[in-house]
Curated annotation (Swiss-Prot):
Residues 199-209 have a biased composition (Low complexity). Contains two Leu-Xaa-Xaa-Leu-Leu (LXXLL) motifs, which may be required for an association with nuclear receptors. The gene is Asxl1. Signal peptide: none annotated. Residues 300-655 are annotated as: Interaction with NCOA1. Keywords: Chromatin regulator, Metal-binding, Nucleus, Phosphoprotein, Repeat, Repressor, Transcription, Transcription regulation, Ubl conjugation, Ubl conjugation pathway, Zinc, Zinc-finger. Residues 98-107 have a biased composition (Acidic residues). Ubiquitinated by TRIP12, leading to its subsequent degradation following binding of N(6)-methyladenine methylated DNA (6mA). This is Polycomb group protein ASXL1. The keyword Transmembrane helix does not apply. GO terms for biological process: animal organ morphogenesis; bone development; bone marrow development; cell morphogenesis; chromatin organization; heart morphogenesis; hematopoietic or lymphoid organ development; hemopoiesis. A motif (LXXLL motif 2) lies at residues 808-812. A zinc finger (PHD-type) spans 1476-1513.
Length: 1514
């Protein structure tokens, strides 16, 4: 016995099994049967803790392989083993039975081994064992047994197993998961196959295990294929060979499924697989890798030998089990996943509607043809994607192809977006919508997604006409956006007839210029490619900010249109939608946006305010240098930021793509120095924007008609677009301006060139002009779109803008006289556009003047000058100066984002633009920049002589603006604009800087913003006028610039606002303005209207001004008729004319800025006829339409103001009242007003302001009455009431309204708002203040404080009591502005006793709050910008509310009256959302957010090293 026991103990499994098989050699046995015999006969001692079956299984399998194996495993589904010696006999039987399953033996092996392994514990042993056994028994059952004994044994085993399984396997109900409400198609296969497989097992004895096996296969297949959805439709009625065992339904969904603990490899083998019905097998085989399936001679797929025995399959099975265990296949999770997938699909309904399996399918193209086209476009597509715009595509390809592709591409998305917007803004004429759409095409590349959504509806009609020419040509070339392209192509084809005339000519010319542009673009794109793509993704990633904005950014310029899904936000998108609104541009952008906004906000607001003041003073000291630096940084920021930001948006790439071709190419390259790659990108973006701003450049004479037509068409489109993306467009203008500044030289020519009038002047700078023209040509569409969108404040305005733009460009680009003449010719230009364009041009002109003076080298010079300016700023600026510059740099870094922001936030950009535009208007219109440039570079005799002081003063103003803008400079948007424009000024006036700096310092000393002393401004204006007269167009433009600057305290405010982009900044400038006013009797008198402008101005200027006044009067008279449409153009023309241009500029400036009152008065004094005319016009317009009312008096000014205010007010006015825009947007055609409430309203305010100003100065009663009427009308319009209140006081005080108006504007766009607010508020305050000269500054300050703290108003009501309650109330009503201003003011005018006294706690609290709320401030500011976008696009009230909210928030944060502000100002919660308080630490060092890479102030980012946005997100 002992021996027996010993033998039994020592006997191996192999020996025991051999004994069993020898004893029972009559038939093959399964491992289980062998084990039973072993156990029964005690052939081997079983040790506890081991799994005998597993061990036996493993031994049998291992010993049945190879030549030396003792055993032989019969091929088949069940592991039947026999001794090798008996193998022949059994193999024959098996062959007859199982011959058709050559793989069975392997499978059985695997099954056995799997069984062993499972049992050994890979999974739940019993479960695995059961399933393995079940599968084995199933196999045995399913396959005929060789003999009765076998069959009996098998059946008994199966029964046993069945019972066991019943016990062991939990009863799992297999509930089918439905994919999209339907079972997964057989193709996806698993569901069906599995379902059957699971459902029925061959013998139904172990259907459970079979089901498991099937499900496992399915799971595996799915895993391999990784389509979770496939698993969802597992269940299908049992069919085929397998019957379903209803007692055992397998759960394929929940983590509690038995399959979680099942070794799928044991379940899924060739045996179980072949047990499935053939069609299920085929479906499942499709899920396997190609290697693992073989095509049989019959064409059916077969498993390869190792298909189910390899790492891949093992891993897939394991991963499926893990996913099952994780609950991935539960219905809820599947629904969630489906939703996510659908979201990722991002195929809007309209896209689904127009969906094509391949590009061109609906056009009748074959797949091959489509593929060929795609291949051709692949590069372009990739590049376009990288560049965020069609831009890269275009540069890569030939100019034509590229442009078409880029254009088309851009158009596809922008157009789609535009169309979508158009959908929203169907009110606007389809044609205009089409143009706008086209205009937005470039800006809206980022918006394209949103647009595309609406596109389905809107696309079809408006988009086509605009993009038809381009799209028609490009249609096939846009494979990247097959659907959009097709749709666009179709639409374009439809619209081709209408758009073709304008567009096609443009395209050819663009093409001509494209070649040069292409190269420029290429360089730009390479840089932009690096920066844009990088930023674009960020934009997309962080579009949460913008989203407003492609975009926005735009895709979410307006919440309605642009949702945060603006990943493709292009520059325009960025401009259109703030990152926060849009998908969220890179936080870097966001922060920059915040920073830019913060920049203005920070500086303008609490900390920023104070810092801004410091900066402003430092800038004064630095003068031009600081400005140069600022401008360089700003330009870089705008260009770089705009480019990358906007580029990220896609607008830059879109428009920038074209722009970038010439202006951007060189400029981008040039500016990279300050900014590096982003700078290049940004600058490219800026240039692009600029070019966009200066669509005329492409005209270069050739394009004049087509370009003009196109711009007009675009304008029309833009009109609708503007409505849709007025914010976006505004931002675009800002971006454009930014771009203009960056691509100033080229853009200038383009601006003037559109009418071809600047072409001759451009001829002198032909290289630049050509580049500009090329750039604009490419950009023309985009730029035109942008411009038109900017101009599109009114449908009419767009056309006028188009004309005006060109003349502006001419002015800037060409000789001053020529420019003026040209401008004159395009009298129909919209003043708004001109102002906008002027601003842009002016900004451009400053660099462009460099370019002009330098000719072909203009671009390089401009770059160098910008660099020079930067250097100067660095060198000349004190630490304070550098801080602003640093801010600018930050802005540059943030500015890129801000630029992106700008791009996403046209309004802020617009504000910048406007801020720029004021000077630009002056410069552009009278070629002040050239003059500035002249004084700087090639001062003409007269220009130099009178430009010396003029330039100085202008520069001073500019510098002050720069300082102001510099203070907010960190806020990229305003910094970009203000910085750019001022930088340009500084650059241009750097040579005049010495005196200028002194002047600026003096002025700035009084007030950073207001250091644009009215008297200084006036003297500047006077000097400018004389310079204008002497220098002709250049001098005139300079004087205009001076006037703008001087008229502008508002201008500085505007600049400040734009530069601060946050109204707070603007407020500060206003206060400073008031301070200056108080300090400067001339200014005070001017503001009061006691002193005619002519008196302040030198004789030369006076005559010039009178001339200007008369011209504008004439033009305005004409305008009255064409006021809504050509009226503005006429004014623009008048402004463009040296004399009339000056007057117009004055008017525009006056209108644009609070100083307009003084300026207008001076103008009125100089040109009473004009004033009266304007007043009459205002009256007539007033009677005609509130909107019209303003136009007559300030057609140009209003237009400019309109642009500025549009930028600024768009939000504001939107908020302030849609009707306001309707009622008080005389500058904008009534249709325009309605169509572009944002635009119109802003112009209305501007108009009203101008009217008031003019009324005071010229026909105080008439204009005041008219203005009052306008104000009342505005009042009638609700939000306008506040404005009206202010306006009424304004007519009394002339500036209060502008001040109030700007507050409204800030709500729309912080930057524009700032501009407007700064200008308007400043003027308002100044004017008010000047009324009581001694109290004027304080009053203004108080008012400003109050204004900016409307919400603070409660807290500051005490102070408000000091000031006119009505005005304060009005301002409060125009809260956005007021609120914004206060923040700006406090930080901006810390030194100002009133400012701080008004908000003593406000400043510190603002600073602290800003720092604490930097994110909030920035966010709020950003939000307002983004909201402004939203409001500007469709909902005026919302924009206004947003602006107000943002302002109030800013003010509230600053004041601690957040609640009241938000409550009072923001019924519009969205506005509150968008409100982004700006950082109050503009002077603090900037550090990079660890989360998003955005640059923010150390205090803002704090120990967490995360910006507020990141913190909020986290």
């Amino acid at each position: 016995m002992k021996d027996k026991q010993k033998r039994k103990k020592e006997r191996t499994w192999a020996e025991a099994a051999r004994l069993v098989l020898e004893n029972y050699s009559d038939a093959p046995m399964t491992p289980k049967q062998i084990l039973q015999v072993i156990e029964a006969e005690g052939l081997k001692e079983m040790r506890s803790g081991t799994s005998p079956l597993a061990c036996l299984n493993a031994m049998l399998h291992s010993n049945s392989r190879g030549g030396e194996g003792l055993f032989y495993k019969l091929p088949g589904r069940i592991s039947l083993f026999t001794l090798k010696k008996d193998a022949v006999q059994w193999s024959r039987n098996a062959a007859t039975v199982d011959g058709d399953e050559p793989e069975d033996s392997a499978d059985v092996e695997s099954c056995g081994s799997n069984e062993a392994s499972t049992v050994s514990g890979e999974n739940d042993v019993s479960l695995d064992e059961t399933s393995s056994n079940a599968s084995c028994s199933t196999e045995s059952q399913s396959r005929p047994l060789s003999n009765p004994r076998d069959s009996h044994r098998a059946s008994s085993q199966a029964n046993k197993q069945k019972k066991r399984t019943g016990v062991m396997l939990p009863r799992v109900v297999l509930t089918p998961l439905k994919v999209n409400g339907a079972h997964v198609e057989p193709a996806s296969g698993f569901s069906g196959r599995h379902a059957d497989g699971e459902s029925g097992s061959p013998s139904s004895s172990s259907s459970g295990s079979l089901a498991l096996g099937n499900s496992a296969i399915r799971g595996q297949a799915e895993v391999t294929r990784d389509p979770a959805p496939l698993l969802r439709g597992f269940r299908k009625p049992a069919t085929g060979q397998m019957k379903r065992n209803r007692g055992e339904e397998v759960d394929f969904e929940t983590p509690g499924s038995i399959l979680v603990n099942t070794n799928l490899r044991a379940l899924i083998n060739s045996r179980t697989f072949h047990a499935l019905p053939l069609h299920f097998q085929q479906q499942l085989l499709l899920l396997l890798p190609e290697v693992d399936r073989q095509v049989g001679t019959d064409g059916l797929l077969r498993l390869s030998g190792s298909a189910l025995n390899n790492e891949f399959f093992t891993h897939a099975a394991q991963s499926w089990r893990e996913r099952l265990a994780d609950g991935e296949f539960t219905h809820e999770m599947q629904v969630r996943l489906r939703q996510e997938m659908e979201k990722e699909k991002k195929v809007e309904q309209w896209k689904e509607k127009f969906f094509e399996d391949y590009y061109g399918q609906k056009l009748g193209l074959t797949k091959e043809e489509s593929l060929q086209q795609k291949e051709v476009q692949e590069e372009a597509k990739v590049k376009s994607g990288l560049c965020v715009s069609g831009e890269s595509v275009r540069p890569q390809r030939g100019p034509n192809t590229r442009q078409r592709d880029g254009h088309f591409k851009k158009r596809s998305r922008p157009d789609l977006r535009t169309r979508s917007r158009r959908n929203i803004y169907k009110k606007q004429e389809p044609e205009q919508a089409g143009v706008a759409k086209d205009a937005s095409a470039a800006p809206d590349v980022s918006l394209s997604k949103d647009t595309k959504t609406d596109l389905a509806g809107v696309n079809s009609t408006p988009g086509p006409d605009v993009s038809s020419a381009t799209s028609g040509q490009e249609g096939p070339k846009c494979p990247s956006e097959p659907v959009a392209s097709q749709i666009q192509a179709e639409r374009d084809n439809l619209a081709c007839a209408s758009a073709s005339p304008d567009r096609i000519p443009t395209l050819p010319q663009d093409t001509v210029d494209q070649e040069t542009k292409d190269q420029k673009r290429k360089s730009f794109e390479q840089e932009a490619s690096a920066s844009f793509p990088e930023k674009k993704p960020r934009l997309e990633d962080r579009q949460s900010f913008r989203n407003t904005i492609e975009s926005v950014h735009t895709e979410k310029p307006q919440p309605t249109k642009e949702e945060p899904k603006v990943p493709p936000i292009r520059i325009q998108l960025s401009r259109i939608k703030p990152p926060w609104v849009a998908k969220g541009r890179p936080t870097y952008q966001i922060c920059p946006r915040i920073v830019p906004i913060t920049e203005s906000s920070c500086r303008g607001w609490t900390g920023a305010r104070t810092l801004a003041d410091i900066k402003a003073r430092a800038l004064q000291a630095r003068g031009a240098r600081g400005y140069h630096c600022n401008r360089e940084t700003a330009t870089t920021a705008i260009g770089g930021g705009g480019g990358p930001g906007g580029g990220g948006s896609g607008a830059i790439d879109e428009g920038g793509g074209r722009d970038s071709s010439s202006g951007d190419g060189s400029e981008a390259c040039g500016h990279p120095e300050p900014r590096g790659a982003p700078s290049t990108s940004g600058e490219s973006a800026s240039d692009l924007q600029r070019t966009q701003l200066l669509p005329p450049c492409p005209l270069n004479g050739e394009h004049t008609p087509a370009e003009a037509a196109m711009p007009r068409a675009r304008r029309e489109d833009s009109a609708s677009l503007r409505k849709e993306e007025s914010c976006l467009l505004k931002r675009v203008p800002g971006v454009l301006t930014s771009g203009l500044e960056d691509a100033s030289q080229p853009p200038i020519a383009p601006t003037g060139d559109q009418p071809c009038q600047a072409l001759p002047p451009l001829s002198s700078q032909t290289p630049v002009a050509e580049m500009l023209t090329e750039q604009p040509k490419l950009l023309l569409d985009d730029r035109t779109e942008c411009e038109s969108s900017r101009e599109d404040q009114g449908p009419t305005i767009p056309s006028e803008s188009s004309s005006g733009r060109f003349p502006l460009g001419d002015l800037l680009g060409g000789g001053s006289d020529q420019a003026f003449d040209n401008m004159k010719e395009p009298v129909s230009m919209t003043p708004t556009f001109i102002s906008e364009l002027s601003l842009a041009n002016y900004l451009q002109d400053r660099p462009d003047d460099d370019g002009l003076g330098l000719g072909a080298t203009g671009l390089l010079i401009r770059e160098s000058s910008r660099q020079e300016a930067l250097t100067e700023a660095f060198a000349s600026g004190s630490p304070t100066s550098w801080v602003p510059i640093l801010s600018n740099y930050e802005v540059i870094k943030t500015s890129d984002p801000e630029s992106r922001e700008n791009i996403p936030c046209p309004e802020p950009q617009d504000e910048k633009e406007w801020e720029r535009a004021v000077p630009l208007i002056a410069a552009t219109e009278s070629v002040p920049q050239p003059e500035s440039c002249i004084s700087h570079w090639t001062p003409p005799p007269a220009a130099v002589g009178s430009t010396g002081s003029d330039s100085e003063q202008v520069d001073l103003e500019r510098l002050e603006m720069n300082g102001i803008s510099e203070a907010p400079s960190p806020h990229s948007e305003s910094t970009d604009t203000a910085s750019d424009s001022e930088g340009h000024l500084s650059e241009d006036s750097s040579e005049v800087d010495a005196s200028e700096v002194t002047v600026v310092k003096g002025s700035l000393g009084g007030d950073e913003k207001q250091d644009w002393d009215p008297s200084a401004s006036l003297s500047k204006v006077n000097n400018d006028l004389s310079v204008l007269t002497r220098t002709g167009g250049v001098a005139a433009s300079q004087s205009w610039v001076s006037r703008v600057c001087s008229v502008p305290h508002k201008i500085p405010d505007s600049l400040l606002l734009s530069s601060t982009e946050c109204q707070p900044r603007s407020v500060c400038p206003l206060r400073p303005g008031s301070s200056v006013e108080v300090t400067n009797p001339l200014v005070m008198h001017l503001l009061h209207g006691n002193l005619p402008l002519e008196k302040v101005l030198p004789p030369g200027h006076r005559s010039s001004r009178l001339e200007s006044s008369q011209l504008p009067l004439r033009e305005q008279s004409q305008d009255r008729g064409t006021l809504q449409g050509t009226g503005e153009n006429n004014r623009l023309a008048a402004r463009i004319n040296p004399g009339s241009a000056q007057t117009l500029k004055e008017s525009i400036l006056a209108q644009s800025y609070g100083a307009s009152a003084g300026l207008v008065r001076a103008m009125a004094s100089k040109a009473p006829a004009m004033s009266q005319k304007i007043a009459k016009m205002v009256t007539s317009l007033d009677s005609q339409h509130p909107e019209t009312e303003l136009t007559p008096s300030s057609g140009n000014l209003e237009e400019i103001d309109s642009k500025e205010h549009l930028s600024s007010f768009l939000c504001e006015e939107q908020k302030e009242g849609h009707s306001l825009s309707q009622g008080s947007d005389p500058g904008a055609a009534p249709g325009q007003c309605l169509g572009d409430h944002t635009t119109s309203k802003v112009p209305c305010f501007s108009s009203t302001n101008v009217s008031l100003s003019f009324g005071s100065e010229q026909t105080d009663g008439t204009l005041s009455d008219q203005n009052n009427a306008g104000g009342h009308e505005k009042k009638l319009f609700g939000p306008g009431n506040t404005v009206t209140t202010l306006q009424c006081p304004r007519s009394e005080e002339q500036t209060p309204l502008p001040a109030e108006v700007p507050p409204v504007f800030p709500s729309r766009k912080i930057e524009p708002s700032k501009n407007s607010v700064s200008g308007g508020v400043q003027t308002t305050r100044e004017n008010r203040m000047p009324k009581p000269p001694p109290v004027s500054a304080d009053s203004i300050k108080t008012e400003q404080t109050f204004l900016r703290d409307p919400i603070k108003a409660d807290a500051e009501n005490r102070k408000a009591a000091g000031y006119s309650s009505l005005e304060l109330v009005g301002h409060l009503q125009g809260m956005p502005f007021v609120v914004d201003l206060p923040f700006w003011k406090l930080p901006r005018e810390p030194g100002k006793g009133f400012s701080q006294p008004l908000e003593p706690s406000s400043i510190p609290s603002q600073l602290n709050i800003k720092q604490a709320l930097y994110g909030k401030l920035s966010k709020l500011q950003l939000s307002p910008t983004s909201f402004n976008y939203s409001s500007s696009s469709a909902t005026f009230p919302k924009g206004l509310a947003g602006g107000v909210v943002q302002l109030s928030h800013k003010a509230s944060f600053g004041t601690g009256h957040t609640a009241s502000l938000s409550l009072q100002m923001f019924a519009d919660s969205s506005a509150v959302e968008s409100i982004s308080l700006q950082c109050a630490c503009s002077l603090k060092a900037m550090i990079m957010c660890q989360g998003c890479g955005a640059f923010c102030h150390d205090d803002c980012i704090g120990p967490s090293k995360l910006c507020v946005l990141c913190l909020v997100v986290r």
